[in-house]
Swiss-Prot record:
Any one GO MF annotation of this record: S-methyl-5-thioribose-1-phosphate isomerase activity
Originating gene: mtnA
Stated family: Belongs to the eIF-2B alpha/beta/delta subunits family. MtnA subfamily.
Descriptive protein name: Methylthioribose-1-phosphate isomerase
Reactions performed catalytically: 5-(methylsulfanyl)-alpha-D-ribose 1-phosphate = 5-(methylsulfanyl)-D-ribulose 1-phosphate
EC number: 5.3.1.23
Source species of the chain: Bacillus velezensis (strain DSM 23117 / BGSC 10A6 / LMG 26770 / FZB42)
Subunit structure: Homodimer.
Enzymatic class: isomerase
InterPro entries: IF-2B-related (IPR000649), IF-M1Pi (IPR005251), IF_2B-like_C (IPR042529), Initiation_fac_2B_a/b/d (IPR011559), M1Pi_N (IPR027363), NagB/RpiA_transferase-like (IPR037171)
Length: 353
């Protein structure tokens, strides 16, 4: 049996505070942080104490619900004004991951018909908790759908961390490996270290070892050689935002892996919930790309590895064109090929069901 339930939850609702696993301290220290204010939540998201698109959305939803509990509003209109201010503030914490805006919009919709402040506060807490509950089942279904793509003994590559600690549980790209472990399918993962913040080495390698899943760590520059020498059968990654045409924003380095996979004729899969799709944008050119602190590149774990004043280009994400993606795995099935039409049909089918 897999040990996935021994892996700490990334975020938990505790009524008067939010408890998060500090992912900046992993793998050396398992530390929890208590978030009590909207500023705490904002900081936790910006500084990557919590990361992964679904986990960011859950944390932001909890943060908005927690802040709303403390509003001292004169009336419902004043409550909604304060709510909108905090929502805007939290929504600005990370611009690329669409789950953040999706979760906050869902909370907004949940109180649209509220007739009292107390009803609104209660509803917000309930809805935020429901988002987390649903995310766990969503991730399990993504894993179930993805599992059909692999066979016993496959060697599979991934980048960044789209695992249990990036979601409520299971993960997206890593979900099939937990389910494969239960079925004794013997899948093996090659995890790219994921410079500059090392989510692959610090988080994915740690998480999979905690779960008893076979994993080998490689540097990002070893990907092509590894594909050739280790007979990689597929690449699977997560996503932070997917455009209407299938173009996908994910951790920097994903685009390069997709190009390599295409060169080696290896299937390249994206695993993501429907909440990661942004049907308001036509293609990847419209996805905002966050640029982060230059010292993330100049330093490793606080130790300087480059000249102090060397200019740095540090985008946190890149865009993989839909043309390089073999399939997008969701909780409702897998879309392939003509993404604009298939994604539109997928959402239409979900509305009918």
């Amino acid at each position: 049996m897999t040990n996935e339930f021994a892996i700490p939850r990334s975020v938990e609702w505790k009524e008067t505070y939010i408890r998060i696993l500090n992912q900046q301290k992993l793998p050396d220290v398992t530390e929890y942080v208590e978030l009590e204010t909207k500023e705490d939540v904002f900081d936790a998201i910006v500084t990557l104490k919590v990361r992964g698109a679904p986990a960011i959305g859950i944390t932001a939803a909890f943060g908005l619900a927690l802040s709303a509990k403390s509003f001292e509003a004169r009336d419902l209109s004043d409550f909604r004004r304060q709510f909108a201010d905090v929502k805007t503030y939290l929504n600005s914490s990370r611009p690329t991951a669409v789950n953040l805006a999706w979760a906050l919009d869902r909370l907004t919709d949940s109180i649209r018909d509220a007739i009292s402040i107390n009803e609104a506060k209660t509803t917000l807490v309930h809805e935020a908790i429901q988002i987390q509950i649903e995310d766990e089942e969503t991730c399990r279904m993504i894993g179930q759908n993805a599992l059909h793509l692999f066979k016993k003994g496959d060697q599979i590559m991934t980048i960044c961390n789209a695992g249990s600690i990036a979601t409520s549980r299971y993960g997206t790209a890593l979900a099939p490996f937990y389910l494969a472990k239960q079925k004794d399918l013997g899948l093996h993962i090659y995890a790219c270290e994921t410079r500059p913040v090392l989510q692959g080495s610090r988080l994915t390698a740690w998480e999979l070892m905690q779960g008893g899943i076979d994993v080998t760590l490689i540097t990002d520059s070893m990907a092509a050689h590894t594909m050739k020498e280790k007979h990689i059968s597929a690449v699977i990654v997560g996503a932070d935002r997917i455009a209407k045409n299938g173009d996908t924003a994910n951790k920097i380095g994903t685009y390069g892996l997709a190009i390599l996979a295409n060169a080696f004729q290896i299937p390249f899969f994206v695993a993501a919930p429907l909440s990661t799709f942004d049907l308001q944008i036509e293609n990847g050119d419209q996805i905002p790309i966050e640029e982060r602190d230059p010292d993330e590149v100049r330093q490793i774990s606080g130790i300087r590895t480059a000249p102090e004043d060397v200019p740095v280009f540090n985008p946190a994400f890149d865009i993989t064109p839909g043309s390089l993606i073999s399939g997008i795995i969701t909780e409702k099935g897998i879309v392939t090929g003509s993404y604009t039409e298939e994604i539109e049909q997928l959402f239409a089918d979900c509305q009918l069901s």
